[in-house]
Amino acid sequence: MLQPKRTKFRKMHKGRNRGLAQGTDVSFGSFGLKAVGRGRLTARQIEAARRAMTRAVKRQGKIWIRVFPDKPITEKPLAVRMGKGKGNVEYWVALIQPGKVLYEMDGVPEELAREAFKLAAAKLPIKTTFVTKTVM
């Protein structure tokens, strides 16, 4: 599972997920999976989508993960009263804005890439679309 090796602070404020995305172009591979919606991806969701893609292409070609879960999400245990401090870090998320390229792929035919990204998109909680590299 993806998570930072070390952070300056253990816990983070909730914050807001507004603004425009960086990393909107396919830069490593030939095909990409781009976010259309806004939301957050957990490390488990990122890994589940990666596994689905890897199995779909039968481990040929190359896959790049363009998102990293760097925001800790805390939860208080069940049946615990409010107060007494912030809860423990339970999982890590990556904040996603529309237009962000989540995954890239190269070394496979376009039809196979489309099928793999379709399987991966089913594992994710946000709407996505298939994109190809544009040559200028």
From Swiss-Prot:
GO biological process, one term: ribosomal large subunit assembly
One CC-aspect GO term: cytoplasm
Gene3D superfamilies hit by this protein: Ribosomal protein L10e/L16 (3.90.1170.10)
In-chain residues carrying the UniProt-annotated modification N-methylmethionine: 1
Sequence positions bearing (3R)-3-hydroxyarginine: 81
InterPro entries (alphabetical): Ribosomal_uL16, Ribosomal_uL16_bact-type, Ribosomal_uL16_CS, Ribosomal_uL16_dom, Ribosomal_uL16_sf
Alphabetical UniProt keywords: Hydroxylation, Methylation, Ribonucleoprotein, Ribosomal protein, RNA-binding, rRNA-binding, tRNA-binding
Post-translational modification: Is hydroxylated on Arg-81 by RoxA. The modification is nearly suppressed when E.coli is grown in anoxia.
Coiled coil regions in record: none
A molecular function (GO) term: rRNA binding
Entry's family note: Belongs to the universal ribosomal protein uL16 family.
Subunit structure: Part of the 50S ribosomal subunit. Cross-links to the A and P site tRNAs. Interacts with assembly factor DarP(YjgA).
NCBIfam families linked: rplP_bact
Role played: Binds directly to 23S ribosomal RNA and is located at the A site of the peptidyltransferase center. It contacts the A and P site tRNAs. One of the last ribosomal proteins to be assembled in the 50S subunit. The simultaneous presence of uL16 and bL36 probably triggers ObgE's GTPase activity and eventual dissociation from the mature 50S ribosmal subunit. It has an essential role in subunit assembly.
Name used for this protein in its record: Large ribosomal subunit protein uL16
Species this protein is from: Escherichia coli (strain K12)
